[in-house]
């Protein structure tokens, strides 16, 4: 991701009333910060640790090689970010009700995250990893899930007829999550 020796650290700052638009941050580690509007801001090789971005406005925000660790990001609309170079990684984050509609997220990583009610409609998640994630109520519709590994995640409901699931990985014990639309009982 980035070379930690050259990273600038910004900690314990509440950016709630600060205008960050048109600013660029490269190799910055934000720790325990709060953000409400980062529209038009560019982040390259940055890390957000323990930050609160819930309901933050991120319109036209650039995120290239950005990682989020232990962040609260409820209701964030990633569909509004710039598409070019979009590359993110999430670990131990709360991503409930986030929107990834039409987002290109191939090879992204979601590790130990709670992603309840998130919208992945028409997103490209090919070759992504969902490691130990709770996907209760997450919406997958016309989503590219080819090569995605769901083997350690739970509570998902995915219709194979409405999504590309070619070479996606599931545990046999989770097959019920693929058959939800049929309203059948599996024992």
Regions found by a protein language model. Give the residues of each.
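Tandem repeat scaffolds
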Residues: 1-187
